[in-house]
Design a protein with these regions (language model features):
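Transmembrane alpha-helical segments and their membrane-water interfaces
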Residues: 20-25, 67-77, 94-149, 352, ...
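Transmembrane alpha-helices of multi-pass inner-membrane enzymes
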Residues: 67, 371-376, 385-436
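Long extracytoplasmic/lumenal interhelical loops at the membrane interface
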Residues: 278-341, 356
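Hydrophobic transmembrane alpha-helices and their immediate junctions
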Residues: 244, 248, 259, 340-376
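N-terminal hydrophobic segments of proteins, predominantly signal-anchor/transmembrane helices
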Residues: 33-51, 60-116, 373-378, 431, ...
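Alpha-helical transmembrane segments of multi-pass inner-membrane proteins
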Residues: 21-22, 136-160, 172-230, 238-248
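A membrane-periplasm/extracellular boundary helix in multi-pass inner-membrane enzymes
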Residues: 147-157, 247-287, 303-305, 435
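Loop-to-helix entry and N-terminal half of a specific, functionally important transmembrane alpha helix
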Residues: 35-42, 359-383, 388
Length: 436
């Protein structure tokens, strides 16, 4: 930061960024739905390695979420919900762990900023923008994402890897992964798994969006096919769960004819996808089974978790590479959370996840809640990576905001059965002024 402010060019860039941010806030304050557009554009079309260093690495997505929070906070009229308290408890424990020196700065930043900002943005946007508008913006955005992923599969060209602006994340996330001799679609997400999970989460929003039925069916088909060409089992299974969840839990949002069409498309799509994916996984040989075995082996790290703070088995070498015992990476969000922050924060979030499953079955359902529940099982096999982290916590915030809205809309109205109450008189209006 000192280097940026110490040079004329750096100071000019900083002033330009602040000016753009101020305009962004003013525009969103006037048209709140543009906050959703800005966040979704940065989420879906900007690779995770693009950003600038201002003491910390700031991505356009983080900036868009922060700008939306600043612009829309006033008037959001949020009330504390149970999950608000749970997340504050978790992030507070992380902050205490950092102050105590048992949580690293990198991990504390990832939780407090990476999760907290996305959640708060979703929470506030959900209070200021109608669910229908949010769902329609998400549907259009992921229609574009799905189209780009399908084009990437057929052309074998990812246009985003040519964007080299930003920090050191390019080397980590820009490489295209292959499975069975076939490149996996990644889009701007830096990972096929992240793209697959995000596509699955978009399904309920497309389902309840204000798009016409034909356009809605087309986008759902594109999203499902795009999930297939990620060749990510997590993405494909989560997408199926999301579609089934929509059919069962959000059926009232569409016509019976549309439900029948989607059910038929689901059967036809499965008939097409199974041979395609089986050929790829067969060609991959032991790669897929080894990947599954590796995730099973991660359970051996559970006894290494501390009650609060990072595990003692975590080491970081001179190159900044972190290892947990003999494992170089942890592809399981619950296990990584327990290793980085401790068992207590993990138990709180596991309890919140179970509450989400109960809520989606017993309370008024919404698209964001169905989206979150659809991917929770997959979190056991994927960590919070790239924009998938923001997508997940943004949806959690939207789900809680919808619950907040519903609690007010459906609150019982208690009628007054006593004698009529005369309103207080206003001087000079309801009573004559005193004569002197």
């Amino acid at each position: 930061m000192a280097q940026i402010l110490g040079s004329p060019d750096g100071l000019s860039v900083m002033l330009l960024v602040l000016a753009v941010g101020a305009v962004f806030v003013v525009v969103i304050r006037a048209r709140p739905v543009l906050g959703v557009v800005g966040c979704l554009a940065a989420l879906c079309l900007v690779p995770p390695w693009v950003g600038a260093g201002f003491g910390v690495f700031v991505t356009p997505l983080l900036a868009a979420c922060l700008g939306s929070i600043v612009a829309l906070w006033h008037g959001s009229d949020m009330r504390l919900r149970a999950f608000d308290a749970a997340l504050v408890l978790v992030l507070g424990a992380v902050a205490v762990g950092f102050v105590a020196g048992i949580v690293t700065l990198e991990r504390a930043f990832a939780a407090v900023i990476g999760w907290g900002v996305a959640y708060l943005a979703g929470r506030i946007i959900g209070m200021r923008v109608s669910p229908g508008d949010v769902a329609t913006v998400v549907a259009v955005a992921f229609g574009v994402v799905a189209t780009l992923a399908i084009l990437e599969f057929f052309t074998r060209n990812n246009v985003f890897v040519d964007i080299k602006l930003g920090g050191n994340g390019y080397a980590r996330w820009s490489g295209i992964r292959w499975r069975g001799g076939v490149p996996r679609a990644e889009g701007a997400w830096g990972s096929a798994i992240a793209l697959g999970g995000a596509l699955a989460m978009s399904v309920p929003f497309v389902w309840v969006s204000r798009l016409r039925s034909a356009a809605k069916a087309l986008v759902l088909t594109a999203v499902a096919f795009a999930a297939v060409v990620t060749f990510s089992r997590i993405g494909m299974i989560s997408t199926i769960l999301a579609l089934v969840g929509c059919l069962v839990l959000l059926g009232s949002a569409v016509t019976p004819a549309f439900r029948r069409v989607v059910a038929a498309l689901l059967v036809v799509g499965a008939a097409i996808a199974v041979p395609l994916t089986s050929d790829v996984f067969t060609a991959a040989g032991d790669e897929a089974s080894n990947s599954a075995d590796y995730r099973g082996d991660l359970l051996s790290l559970v006894p290494e978790m501390s009650w609060l703070g990072g595990t003692g088995s975590m080491t970081t070498n001179a190159a900044g590479e972190t290892r947990y015992g003999s494992f170089g990476s942890i592809d399981s969000a619950p296990i990584l959370l327990g290793l980085d922050y401790g068992v207590l924060p993990l138990l709180v979030l596991v309890g919140a996840s179970l509450a989400a499953f109960v809520a989606v079955l017993r309370t008024r359902r919404n698209a964001a809640l169905v989206a979150v529940v659809a991917v929770i099982p997959g979190l056991t096999s994927v960590a919070f990576i790239t924009q998938f982290t923001t997508m997940f916590w943004l949806c959690v915030g939207l789900a809680v905001a919808d619950a907040d809205r519903s609690a007010r809309a459906y609150a019982p109205q208690v009628s007054w059965t006593g004698p009529p109450v005369r309103p207080l008189a206003r001087a000079g209006a309801d009573r004559p002024a005193l004569l002197g």
